[in-house]
Amino acid sequence: MSIKNKMKDFFGLEEDPNSTYEEEEYAVANAAAPSTTETSVVRQDDRPKSANNLVALNTKKKDRSKVVLAEPRVFAEAQDISDHLKENRAVIVNLQRMSKEQSRQVVNFLSGVVYALEGSMTSIGHNTILCTPNNVELTGSISNLISEDELHSKGW
């Protein structure tokens, strides 16, 4: 068998001798039947076959990424933030409404959560941090153009 014939067999381009026999048998059966059945067979064959072969490409609903904004006032709210991280959501945490000691505890707690989830934690402003799980890639940086002393003098 030549390569050309093998390729035809592989792609199904070569006619099978058995298929011509079936077609001849079908044609003989249709010739013997009354003309009303012949027209019904023709009508069935005239239907568009693409309707049966439709496949929806968007069958799976895409999971959208979410970013949660959190502004905890007490340390106990840090557990809610960690739950969001465990559910693969990025969290922006504003610590301005907490005392310095409590905000330090929240940062320590969240750094442990982020480490356990193999995520990352980045400061994005004065008393504001971004915690991301491992499925979120963070690119770029925010430079601190204003020193913290200037922020405190302006009341920020």
Swiss-Prot record:
Keywords from the UniProt entry: Cell cycle, Cell division, Cytoplasm, Septation
GO biological process, one term: FtsZ-dependent cytokinesis
GO cellular component, one term: cytoplasm
Subcellular location: Cytoplasm
Subunit architecture: Homodimer. Interacts with FtsZ.
Family classification: Belongs to the SepF family.
Protein name, per record: Cell division protein SepF
Organism listed in the record: Exiguobacterium sp. (strain ATCC BAA-1283 / AT1b)
Gene: sepF
